């Protein structure tokens, strides 16, 4: 089974419905700007935080452009967490649409 993927165009609708977004970029990248409400779990810590992704509803994983988030999704999928969805285009694509980003440590 392959990892599900959505475009940044779909993310606003998902956020409006209360979707959970996990940002796997490094802390300094997250602080510079992230999707409103996103939870920061850097890619290097994903293997130690698998349980944070086990939720009854889909978890949308984002990074800068979609590469690191896809790696995180593939790892999680292989670890049995199948409700993860990659956000293709990432934070850069989301911002390019004119969508607002938050800054600071935690959403």
Where are these regions (language model features)?
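Rhodanese-like catalytic fold shared by cysteine-dependent sulfurtransferases
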Residues: 1-20, 26-58, 67-107
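Short, surface-exposed ligand- or partner-binding patches at beta-edge/loop junctions that are enriched
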Residues: 62
């Amino acid at each position: 089974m392959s990892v599900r993927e959505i475009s940044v165009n779909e993310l606003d609708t998902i956020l409006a419905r209360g979707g959970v977004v996990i940002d796997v970029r490094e802390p300094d990248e997250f602080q510079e700007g992230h999707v409103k409400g996103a939870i920061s779990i850097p890619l290097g810590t994903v293997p130690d935080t698998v349980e944070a992704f086990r939720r009854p509803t889909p978890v949308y994983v984002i990074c800068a452009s979609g590469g690191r988030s896809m790696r995180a999704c593939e790892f999680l999928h292989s670890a049995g967490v199948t409700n993860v969805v990659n956000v293709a285009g990432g934070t850069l694509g989301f911002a390019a649409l004119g969508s607002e980003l938050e800054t600071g440590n935690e959403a």
